[in-house]
Amino acid sequence: MRILLTNDDGIHAEGLSVLERIALTISDDVWVVAPEVDQSGLAHSLTLSEPLRLRQVSERHFALRGTPTDCVIMAARKILDRKPDLVLSGVNIGANLADDVTYSGTVAGAIEGTLQGIRSIAVSQAYHHAVGGAVSWDVAETHAPALIRTLMNVELPDGTLLNVNFPNCAADAVAGVEVTSQGKLEFGLSIDERIDGRGYPYFWLRFGERYGDFRSGTDIHAVRENRISVTPLKLDLTDYTVQERIARALREGTGA
């Protein structure tokens, strides 16, 4: 089985090395195509305004000056002689929960794999940003191999990917695996305005304390309770529940 690895933290990210160790417990045919530099928060973006520069790091490791989406496209359509059987994107430094998935380059790597017709899983590791920036990968390294093997054999409809988040706890403190829905988070987002050396303003987006809906059954609730969250996500963003309501309003508004 051929496995393609990508991420959004870049080719030198520790989480990518962790993911490669995980993948090698499943198959010996593992390829890495990852961004040359950090592409966090770029979501499912393509590079269209400049060329894609590819650097071969080793026989099966490639760095691309592009986004995670670019990486999966290049791997599937250029680098590999045949499509992989599985795309793993991660392991991201920090969880990708709730509204995170709309911004996440990690999830986007799995989205693009799904668009290419490949079984795809996004993998992220929660951690507390305030505690010295240290990330413990033990949970992912311990539990991901068996979990991925199981998820590989689950029949999924076309256009569905899986978003896996590991809790921030000791590996032996994990309270199981939960299939979850996407929760709702507020990011406490603010704009930090500063002045450069020439007196011109510039800005940073600053994330504050997160808060949200921690209802049972959601990804954020599961991770908070030290459970591994597995959320199936659909590429089809249509809200079927309001189609008829809108159609009725249009009929009544136009007299149709």
From Swiss-Prot:
Reaction(s) this enzyme catalyzes, per UniProt: a ribonucleoside 5'-phosphate + H2O = a ribonucleoside + phosphate
Keyword rRNA-binding among record annotations: no
GO CC, alphabetical: cytoplasm
Source organism, top-level taxon: Bacteria
Residues at which a divalent metal cation binds: 8-9, 40, 92
Record keywords, A-Z: Cytoplasm, Hydrolase, Metal-binding, Nucleotide-binding
Listed cofactors: a divalent metal cation
EC number: 3.1.3.5
Protein location: Cytoplasm
Cofactor annotation remark: Binds 1 divalent metal cation per subunit.
InterPro entries with a match to the protein in the record: SurE, SurE-like_Pase/nucleotidase, SurE-like_sf
UniProt function note: Nucleotidase that shows phosphatase activity on nucleoside 5'-monophosphates.
Family: Belongs to the SurE nucleotidase family.
Protein name as it appears in the record: 5'-nucleotidase SurE
Source species of the chain: Sinorhizobium fredii (strain NBRC 101917 / NGR234)
Lineage: Bacteria, Pseudomonadati, Pseudomonadota, Alphaproteobacteria, Hyphomicrobiales
Gene, per the UniProt record: surE
